[in-house]
Curated annotation (Swiss-Prot):
Catalytic activity: L-glutamate + ATP = L-glutamyl 5-phosphate + ADP
Protein name (database record): Glutamate 5-kinase
PANTHER family for this protein: GLUTAMATE 5-KINASE (PTHR43654), ISOPENTENYL PHOSPHATE KINASE (PTHR43654:SF1)
HAMAP family membership: ProB
Gene assigned in the entry: proB
């Protein structure tokens, strides 16, 4: 837990930090990448790097740069055009980051990910190893979504979500999301001049979504996506700071403890590596709607999910696939590796353990999902 002492946050002990910088902070009013701005960010990142922090950078800006290079007046809305813009702009984005970091004798590495890379266990572990090697070599990974090959089914959707997933993957001590807003307000400051900036909130507080607003022209993420990302990072035990990138030397100042932005705290212990991989599944093979008793058993008692607690089986999945468990309102409770196919799950849903044997006529696990193979939300 990050402490606040004498009006300052104790962030200096956060060694491994994922920093996400939004499009509006990297582009010149929509006129392509802003070299001066990126050089300014490189200086701040270099200062943290040289102070011993391990920085993983998630950088937006590829689509915005591609739009300028192709002389497009507005952001494309269809996926193929977005993919083409990203492919064109990514060349300029990574070249710029590499050049400005080289000015500080720091090497950069390009890492492109899709959700499918993290959902596949082998690729997830491979990317973990690659990122760890880069960190060990004191190279700064510059991460972006691999828009060119992503489809709607395997997209993160925005770099806020990607940053949260990476924070869990690398066991980060802190996620910093830099945006054009000061942080989280108790109401939309664009419509309420009396809106107050929240200094510290709990990432799990549902009321936060009611306070969030929409996104800008060049980026995909508004405050809603940032709140969702903070909650996702919190599931891995990683706190999130959302702050304005327009504040002078914001990275150095927040790491020195200055109370800028909004800190999203977590009261969850860090998940195991296997649980973090499970939590990385934004899309799953199927869904189990569970009753209130099962929700309580999972969330409060950390029990396995038994067939008796399952009300509805949705989707087609095989034994060992990752599925999500939701309550009767559709809110995600957990994700886990299921011990039965969707066909068998449909047969045994709602049955007590003694009847499962009778119906299936074979000895097998009594749990629909064992607690050791479950990530709780």
């Amino acid at each position: 837990m990050i402490e606040v002492v004498d009006g300052q946050r104790k962030l200096s002990e956060c060694k491994r930090i994922v920093v996400k910088i939004g499009s509006s902070l990297l582009t010149a009013n929509g006129q392509g990448l802003d070299l001066d701005a990126i050089s300014h960010w490189a200086k701040q990142i270099a200062d943290l790097h040289n102070a011993g922090h391990e920085i993983i950078l998630v950088s937006s800006g590829a689509v915005a740069e591609g739009m300028v290079r192709m002389k497009l007046a507005s952001r494309p809305t269809d996926l193929p055009s977005l993919q083409a813009c990203a492919a064109i702009g990514q060349m300029g984005l990574i070249h710029t980051w590499s050049s400005v970091l080289e000015n500080h004798s720091i090497r950069a590495a390009q890492v492109l990910l899709t959700h499918d890379d993290l959902a596949d266990r082998r690729r997830y572990l491979n990317s973990c190893d690659a990122l760890q090697n880069l960190i060990d070599w004191r190279v700064i990974p510059v991460i972006n979504e691999n828009d060119t090959v992503s489809t709607d089914e395997i997209r993160f959707g925005d770099n806020d979500t990607l940053a949260a997933m990476v924070a869990g993957q690398v066991h980060a001590d802190l996620l910093i999301i830099l945006t054009d807003q000061q942080g989280m307000f108790d109401s939309d400051p664009r419509h309420n001049p009396d809106a107050k900036l929240l200094s510290t909130v709990r990432a799990t507080d549902d009321v936060l979504f009611e306070m969030a607003g929409g996104g800008g022209v060049l980026g995909r993420g508004g405050m809603v996506t940032k709140v969702r990302a903070a909650r996702l990072a919190a599931k891995s035990g990683c706190p999130t700071l959302i702050a304005s990138g327009e504040s002078d030397n914001v990275l150095s100042r927040v790491m020195a403890g200055e109370m800028l932005g909004t800190l999203f705290t977590t009261d969850k212990d860090r998940m195991t590596a296997h649980q973090q991989w499970l939590a990385a599944h934004l899309q799953t093979a199927g869904r189990l709607v569970i009753d209130d008793g099962a929700v309580e058993a999972i969330k409060l008692k950390h029990r396995s999910l038994l067939p008796v607690g399952v009300k509805t089986v949705e989707g087609h999945f095989d034994r060992g696939d990752v599925v999500e468990c939701v309550d009767k309102q559709g809110k995600r409770v957990a994700v886990g590796r299921v011990n039965f196919s969707s066909r068998s799950a449909e047969i045994i849903k709602g049955l007590s353990s003694d009847k499962v044997y009778q119906v299936l006529g074979e000895a097998r696990s009594l749990e629909m999902i064992h607690r050791d193979h479950m990530a709780i939300y």
